[in-house]
Design a protein with these regions (language model features):
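Catalytic cores of carbohydrate-active enzymes across secretory and cytosolic contexts
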Residues: 1-526
């Protein structure tokens, strides 16, 4: 029986030029929809239409500045002309839907972008969907009313029937007061502070009365709890994250469906060409990537060198040396992700570069405009890069999906060192694996499942005991592991190629949205 799924997400990264995403959550949403289209599933998606995107990162005098991310949405999206309205703060707000149809291998998925930038609305209401993750509590709740309640209304106006409403994170939880049909919920937040909560006073003021009357809550409305209470199926995004979520929300059944990435999107051309030539059907069945074991080592090595050259051309100055070991680190710049951990002992880093005839590190990542600590970390990365003599550090300004593909494929090692317990899943290491790039990471999120020591990558701080100085222990471990890794890379080429193959055959073949979607089909949309 065909199942109609409507997938709601505050951000969706379907293509780099459609600027309705900020990072991992949006790209995961896009990858999920691509997998649905590849399998010809009846999926529809709903998000907001951010005319000013997230923001454009500009580096001036060693500091991050933000500019609007204006983009030509009117050329990229189709104006459906279909409208609905929702009450926000006592006012009727008009919403129009724009559409983008993503063509997959065996079907297409329609994505609807909700826009309040209409002449019928006041100037303040026009701005409600203008930019992603901006404004205070009031603006955030207004966006969530538009996404959840407005989105459910829009689907009715469009004549789209839905069996399952899938809420990708709690932002769309208010759809539970509007939409009929089964609800599915995926939480991505591993720490209590990350869950959206709104005061009773604000909720009573902002929400439409008929929807408000369906809510039963105390002094504040927790969107994660609202979604959990109204869903037939809920899940976290890795085994560990599901455990943490069950501890945070006792009394709720929370399953684990570990995230994945869309294999065809995240395999750079030298690797996708290699797979096309040797593995029939891998694009719709990436489990077949286990067959990479049968491809000649020299071809895998050649594909990596081509990716490295592409990355060099992609960098503004193009000075990346093909022969030198290169590390990549790119993600949102925020304190728990510790982008400056590798710089804790500059002398140690310099000596590694001396011993192995050079070291290159490529960085990328934006800090949220209101995250002063995150912005400070961007400045610190830039400052440290100037202090090093033997280590060449590159920073990619205004990091995007395009930059991400060049980086995960063009570096030799992917570095990820979040503080433990703060990473729900993480997906950049999965993208790296599709391009034969092993990961060095703290044991957290998906890496607890994906790391086979010395085979697919390495762990940082394995002997860490809670309560100890995490930064000190992890930085010491990081340098020790780099010594081991760089030694293999420079002196044991065959072993290194074996590790590259393992990344593809063991991790890329499993940590993909094809496998992930099949798990949702079996457990959530059944």
């Amino acid at each position: 029986m065909a199942r109609n799924v409507s997938y709601f997400s505050m951000e969706i990264g379907i293509k780099p030029e459609i600027k309705t995403y900020s990072g991992g959550l949006g790209v995961l949403a896009g990858d999920t929809l691509k997998a649905a289209a590849d399998h010809g599933l009846n999926f529809t998606a709903v998000t907001l239409m951010y005319r000013k995107g997230y923001f454009t990162q500009v580096i001036q005098d060693g500091k991050q500045k933000e500019e609007p991310q204006n983009w030509d949405y009117f050329e990229k999206l189709e104006d459906t002309g279909v409208k609905t309205k929702v009450q926000v703060d006592g006012r009727d707000v008009e919403i129009k839907a724009w559409k983008y149809a993503y063509e997959g291998e065996n079907g297409e998925v329609e994505i609807y972008f909700l826009d309040t930038g209409l002449d019928e609305n006041s100037e303040g209401d026009k701005e409600l969907t203008e930019q992603l993750y901006m404004g205070g509590q009031k603006e955030r709740l207004a966006q969530e009313i538009i996404l959840g309640i407005g989105g459910a209304k829009m689907l009715k106006e469009l004549g789209i029937s839905t069996d399952y409403y899938h809420m990708n994170e709690g932002h769309s939880a208010l759809l539970t007061t509007e939409a009929e049909g089964e609800k599915v919920f995926t939480t991505h937040t591993p720490v209590p502070a990350g869950h959206d909560k709104f005061s009773r006073e604000l909720v009573e003021r902002m929400m439409p009365k008929e929807n408000l009357n369906q809510l039963d809550f105390g002094n504040e409305l927790n969107m994660t709890e609202l979604a959990l209470e109204n869903s037939r199926y809920s899940n976290g995004v890795s085994d560990r994250h599901a455990e943490v979520s069950r501890e945070m929300f006792p009394g709720h059944e929370i399953d684990a469906v570990t995230n994945g990435v869309h294999s065809a999107t995240w395999s750079a051309k030298p690797f996708s060409d290699l797979y096309d030539d040797n593995i029939q059907g891998w694009r719709t069945d990436p489990a077949r990537l286990t067959k990479v074991a049968g491809i000649e080592d020299s071809k895998i090595w050649k594909a990596k060198q081509e990716c490295k050259l592409k990355l060099s051309h992609h960098l503004e100055n193009g000075n990346l040396d093909q022969e030198i070991f290169t590390i990549g680190f790119a993600r949102r710049s925020t304190d728990y992700k510790r982008p400056t951990l590798i710089f804790r002992d500059l002398d140690r880093l310099e000596s590694l570069a001396e011993e192995y005839k050079g070291l290159q590190i490529v960085f990328g990542g934006k800090a949220h405009p209101e995250d002063d600590r995150g912005k400070e970390l961007v400045s610190k990365v830039l400052k440290f890069s100037e202090m090093l003599e033997n280590v060449d550090v590159f920073f990619i300004e205004d990091y995007s999906m395009e930059d991400s593909l060049e980086m995960v494929s063009g570096v030799d090692l992917w570095l990820n060192n979040p503080r433990r317990g703060q990473e729900a899943s993480g997906t950049s290491g999965m993208k790296a694996a599709h391009n034969g790039t092993p990961q060095l990471s703290t044991p957290d999120g998906w890496w607890l499942e994906g790391c086979i020591k010395g085979k697919t990558g390495w762990n940082i701080g394995e002997n860490y005991v809670k309560g100890e100085d995490e930064d000190r222990i992890d930085s010491e471990s990081l340098y020790e592991k780099l010594e081991e890794i760089m030694s293999i890379y420079s002196q044991e080429r065959q072993e290194w190629i074996n590790i590259m193959e393992n990344c593809i055959t063991l991790n890329a073949s499993h940590f993909n949205t094809d496998r992930m979607l099949k798990e949702y089909l079996a457990r959530a949309y059944n």
